[in-house]
Structures are given as structure tokens and as C-alpha cells.
């Protein structure tokens, strides 16, 4: 009886094994297997053709912006000397036109030229009619050239003078605070001191260094 059962189960086992083998063969020979095989061949061919230390071109290996090429120091020095010589010629001939300057005074920056008026919301310990020199000059410009400070220009290179022409007070400003049904009301009048300056002259050195 046991031999008959074993003989009957043996064909069933062989049939299942043959079915499983046929499924694995069909799966390996399908379109997915072909694509995987071609991808593996392509990867192996790329790895074989790329040299040692090859870095692919990406946004990290090669940035999208152009490479900055620094100028030659000798060429830059020669160009600087030419520009300075040309500016010296303009200054010596007085052909620079009307000068303007950017000065730092009373915690503000002012762009001024000759005969300009500056209204400063501050009180200065200077009497009317006195002449002062603005030492913090950030920039001086003309028609054809501009001298930039880093951050300030030297005192021996530029001179800006001004005169105090008026010391007065601002127009009264009323600051009113009120809360209804609270019996709260506060009134304050604000008056700030003011000083008016007139720019007299803007002068530059006769020759740059």
C-alpha cells in the first residue's frame, strides 16, 4: 500500500518540478530580463571605457557659471599706471569739470557739490559763520573719472569745506495720545534743533600718488 502511494506521488512531484523550471526559464527569457541584460552590458562597457579617476560632468563638478580668469599681475599694474597718468593729466590741466563728493557727516551720507545746502537734524557746537572741514570723504567724482575710498579717501588727497550759515529749530510736531472713556490724554510737542551748512569748496590734490 505504501509503495503504491509513493509511486503515485512521484509523477506529481516530477510534474511540479518541471513546471517550476519552465516558469523560471520563461521569466529569464522575457523582455525584462533582456533589458536588464542590456543595461548590465552598457554599464560594464562604460566602466571599461572610462579612464581612471574619471569625474562625470555635473553641476557640482563643473558649475554652470563661467570660470573666472584672473588678469595677469604685470598687465594689471601697467593698466593701473596708465589710468593714473591719464587722471593726473586731467587734474593738471583743470579739465575735470565740476566736482562732486559723497561725505559722511552727522551719521548720514550726503552727496554734495559746491554751493549745496545741507540740513542736519542735530545741534553742533559750532557758531554761525565758522568754517569746518569734512574729513570723512567716501567718494569724489568728475566728468571723466571717480576716486573711490576703501572706505575713506586720504586727507591729503581731497578736501571738502563747509560753512555754518544757520542754527534754528524744526517746525513743532504734536504727538497726541488719547483713549476714549478712560480719561487719558497726553500731548507732547516735539521740536528738534537744526543746523544748515553750505558746501564751499571741493578740492583734490594736484597729483595722485
From Swiss-Prot:
Component of the mitochondrial ribosome large subunit (39S) which comprises a 16S rRNA and about 50 distinct proteins. Residues 46-70 are annotated as: Disordered. Belongs to the bacterial ribosomal protein bL21 family. Transmembrane segments: none annotated. InterPro entries: bL21-like, bL21-like_sf. The keyword Ribonucleoprotein applies. This is Large ribosomal subunit protein bL21m. GO terms for molecular function: structural constituent of ribosome. It is found in: Mitochondrion. It comes from Bos taurus.
Amino acid at each position: 500500500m505504501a509503495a503504491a502511494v509513493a509511486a503515485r506521488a512521484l509523477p506529481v512531484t516530477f510534474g511540479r518540478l518541471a513546471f517550476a523550471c519552465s516558469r523560471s526559464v520563461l521569466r529569464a527569457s522575457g523582455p525584462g530580463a533582456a533589458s536588464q541584460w542590456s543595461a548590465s552590458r552598457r554599464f560594464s562597457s562604460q566602466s571599461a571605457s572610462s579612464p581612471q579617476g574619471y569625474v562625470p560632468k555635473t553641476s557640482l563638478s563643473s558649475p554652470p557659471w563661467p570660470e573666472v580668469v584672473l588678469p595677469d599681475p604685470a598687465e594689471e599694474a601697467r593698466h593701473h599706471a596708465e589710468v593714473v597718468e591719464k587722471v593726473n593729466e586731467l587734474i593738471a590741466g583743470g579739465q575735470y569739470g565740476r566736482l562732486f563728493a559723497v561725505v559722511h557727516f552727522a551719521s548720514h551720507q550726503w552727496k554734495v557739490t559746491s554751493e549745496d545746502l545741507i540740513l542736519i537734524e542735530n545741534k553742533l557746537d559750532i557758531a554761525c559763520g565758522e568754517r569746518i572741514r569734512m574729513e570723512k570723504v567716501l567718494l569724489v567724482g568728475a566728468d571723466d573719472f571717480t576716486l573711490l575710498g576703501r572706505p575713506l579717501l586720504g586727507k591729503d588727497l581731497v578736501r571738502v569745506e563747509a560753512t555754518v550759515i544757520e542754527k534754528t529749530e524744526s517746525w513743532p510736531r504734536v504727538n497726541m495720545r488719547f483713549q476714549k472713556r478712560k480719561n487719558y490724554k497726553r500731548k507732547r510737542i516735539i521740536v528738534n534743533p537744526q543746523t544748515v551748512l553750505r558746501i564751499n569748496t571741493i578740492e583734490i590734490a594736484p597729483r595722485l600718488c
